[in-house]
């Protein structure tokens, strides 16, 4: 076996040697598996570097120690690899999916996504998973023979389906997409390169998705404590974190609040990882899938929180929503961020010359706002960092919110 070609440990794991391939054929690497190459391509992409200056919750200039999309992504990848290793899955595919999962987020996090979605209403809307797919299949320009990163089918599938199927067998949208339909970027690509939107994704993709949940919960608690939006003792309102805080107090009665918070975050991550592994092992023992295709056809997720952990995790999300995401300070800044995104879209719509040359309408292309030009503007704004969006707004407008 070649260097770097570690085989998956379990029959239900994805195997790079049996990948369904890439949209554009390439010779295999002598030193890296197909999934390792995907992982490396994501890391070296321009979109990945931009995550450094994209918001997780707090805008980039609010503090050097708050999480950005990049630090969050690295933390998701660490948790995902730990889960994959424990379950005998392909760690490289798992890591590639964890590293790619947030590439499509616009500046200012979910506030930016809401604003762009409103701006693109009538032109297909904006969905960050669809934008991730656009980035890795079209918008990255690093290779002479193709646009995008030419990732394997398995990585593209996981990018799109990590939260479950998007459609039924008749191609009718289901779940979160039932009302508005499958995002146009996903639907268009799926016609070229069938991602089987009706099936579940691989276990590696399911692991990356649940690692995202674990990282969000634990690290947003950490950032919320650091920002002073709530205190460690406020977390006693939930049974799981209350028990952990009590255990920390028993073992370290004189610990200061900073270290108590850090111990709580570590303990929460460890607890949720252990719970997921236990539940996954139980489900896999019951289902006994003999291949990754049997995983896809199983009809339900095999990676999940057990009921008690799912209830605890839902309570944590509800706490964070009330005490952090809807905190007046955060809401004020995010409202101003939405204004910046809407203003930029309107200016580029009304004055195409305000766009950089490479984003201008091509010769012969209509300068009226149609779906193609609206998407071009949306792609440009979605690729901005928080810092660039603020700087660009200052260039184009007399007054720009301070976002503080």
Curated annotation (Swiss-Prot):
Span of domain HD: 69-217
Q: Which domain of life is it from?
A: Bacteria
Gene3D superfamilies per record: Hypothetical protein af1432
Keywords attached to this Swiss-Prot or TrEMBL record, sorted alphabetically, are:
Hydrolase
Region (Disordered), start-end ranges: 1-32
Q: Which InterPro entries match?
A: dGTPase, dGTPase-like, dNTPase_2, HD/PDEase_dom, HD_domain, PHydrolase_assoc_dom
Q: Where is the composition biased (Basic and acidic residues)?
A: 22-32
Which family does the record claim for this protein? Answer: Belongs to the dGTPase family. Type 2 subfamily.
Q: Which NCBIfam families match?
A: dGTP_triPase, PRK01286.1-1, PRK01286.1-3
What protein is this chain from?
Deoxyguanosinetriphosphate triphosphohydrolase-like protein
């Amino acid at each position: 076996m070649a260097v770097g070609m570690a085989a998956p440990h379990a029959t239900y794991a994805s195997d790079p040697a049996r990948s369904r391939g890439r949209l554009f054929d390439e010779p295999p690497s002598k030193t890296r598996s197909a999934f390792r190459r995907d992982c490396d391509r994501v890391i070296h992409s321009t979109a990945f570097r931009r995550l450094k200056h994209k918001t997780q919750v707090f805008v980039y200039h609010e503090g050097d120690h708050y999480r950005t999309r990049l630090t969050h992504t690295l933390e998701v990848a660490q948790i995902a690899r730990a889960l994959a290793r424990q379950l005998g899955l392909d760690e490289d595919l798992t890591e590639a999916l964890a590293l790619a999962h947030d590439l499509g987020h616009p500046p200012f996090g979910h506030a930016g996504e809401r604003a762009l979605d409103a701006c693109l209403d009538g032109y297909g809307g904006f969905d960050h998973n669809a934008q991730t797919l656009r980035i890795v299949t079209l918008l990255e320009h690093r290779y002479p023979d193709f646009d995008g990163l030419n990732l394997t089918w398995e990585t593209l599938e996981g990018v799109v389906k990590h939260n479950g199927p998007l459609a039924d067998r008749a191609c009718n949208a289901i779940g979160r997409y039932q009302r508005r339909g499958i995002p146009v970027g996903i639907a268009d690509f799926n016609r070229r390169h069938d991602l089987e939107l009706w099936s579940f994704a691989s276990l590696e993709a399911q692991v990356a998705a649940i690692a995202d949940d674990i990282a969000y919960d634990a690290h947003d608690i950490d950032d919320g404590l650091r920002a002073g939006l709530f205190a460690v003792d406020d977390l006693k309102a939930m049974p799981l974190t209350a028990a952990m805080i009590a255990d920390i107090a028993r073992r370290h009665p004189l610990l200061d609040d900073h270290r108590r918070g850090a111990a709580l975050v570590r303990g929460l991550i460890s607890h949720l990882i252990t719970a997921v592994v236990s539940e996954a092992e139980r489900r896999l023992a019951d289902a006994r899938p003999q291949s990754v295709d049997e995983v896809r056809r199983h009809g339900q997720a095999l990676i999940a929180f057990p009921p008690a952990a799912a209830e605890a995790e839902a309570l944590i999300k509800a706490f964070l929503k009330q005490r952090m995401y809807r905190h007046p300070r955060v809401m004020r800044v995010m409202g101003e961020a939405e204004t910046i995104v809407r203003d930029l879209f309107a200016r580029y719509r009304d004055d195409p010359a305000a766009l950089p040359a490479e984003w201008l309408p091509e010769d012969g292309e209509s300068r009226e706002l149609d779906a193609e030009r609206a998407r071009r503007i949306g792609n440009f704004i979605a690729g901005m960092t928080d810092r660039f969006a603020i700087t660009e707004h200052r260039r184009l407008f007399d007054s720009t919110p301070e976002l503080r």
